[in-house]
């Protein structure tokens, strides 16, 4: 078979023909590959303003912010869970995405911030303690009544 039949740009005596002949010889294969590497490396430039920028490096320069990536991951997990297919891996990914979201400050817990509107040295009138448990709330117990249970020989606090 003649190689010119398969490749119409094949020219006898060209470097392409030399590389094909040498590639058949196992001992010369490493020499040819090093020569081609040297040729490819000679095309590189040090100048940063050169116009030949690879698309791969452009893609690396346009990285997304971490927060946007986490939000996209959460949305992807939400869409995945809406399909009805839930595996151990999808559950683990969803938990990790939520954890990352919370760690990056996406979830704000309700915090009580003290406000000092009164001048210093003036104490605010304290409100009586009100027990928030369900038993005290449902029975209408008062903490002052709880304190009087053991002191039966004293007068009641009510006038």
Curated annotation (Swiss-Prot):
GO terms for cellular component: cytoplasm; female pronucleus; nucleus. Mediates binding to H3K9me2 via N-terminal region, while ability to exclude TET3 from the maternal pronucleus requires the C-terminal part. This is Developmental pluripotency-associated protein 3. It holds the Pfam family PGC7_Stella. It comes from Homo sapiens. Low expression in testis, ovary and thymus. Expressed in embryonic stem and carcinoma cells. Highly expressed in testicular germ cell tumors. Residues 149-159 have a biased composition (Polar residues). Keywords: Chromatin regulator, Cytoplasm, Developmental protein, Nucleus. It comes from the Eukaryota. GO terms for molecular function: histone H3K9me2/3 reader activity; methylated histone binding. Residues 1-31, 140-159 are annotated as: Disordered. InterPro entries: Dppa3. It is found in: Nucleus; Cytoplasm. GO terms for biological process: epigenetic programing of female pronucleus. Primordial germ cell (PGCs)-specific protein involved in epigenetic chromatin reprogramming in the zygote following fertilization. In zygotes, DNA demethylation occurs selectively in the paternal pronucleus before the first cell division, while the adjacent maternal pronucleus and certain paternally-imprinted loci are protected from this process.
């Amino acid at each position: 078979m003649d190689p010119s039949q398969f490749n119409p740009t094949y020219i006898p005596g060209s470097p392409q023909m030399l590389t094909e002949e040498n590639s058949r010889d196992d001992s010369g294969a490493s020499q040819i590959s090093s020569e081609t590497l040297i040729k490819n490396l000679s095309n590189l430039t040090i100048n940063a303003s050169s116009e030949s920028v690879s698309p791969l490096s452009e893609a690396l320069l346009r990285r997304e912010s971490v927060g946007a990536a986490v939000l996209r991951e959460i949305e992807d997990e939400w869409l995945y869970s809406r399909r009805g297919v839930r595996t151990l891996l999808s559950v683990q990914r969803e938990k990790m995405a939520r954890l990352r979201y919370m760690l990056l400050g996406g979830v704000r817990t309700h915090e009580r911030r003290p406000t000092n509107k009164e001048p210093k040295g003036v104490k605010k009138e304290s409100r009586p303690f009100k027990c928030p448990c369900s038993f005290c709330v449902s029975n209408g117990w008062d903490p002052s009544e709880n304190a009087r249970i053991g002191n039966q020989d004293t007068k009641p606090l009510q006038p």
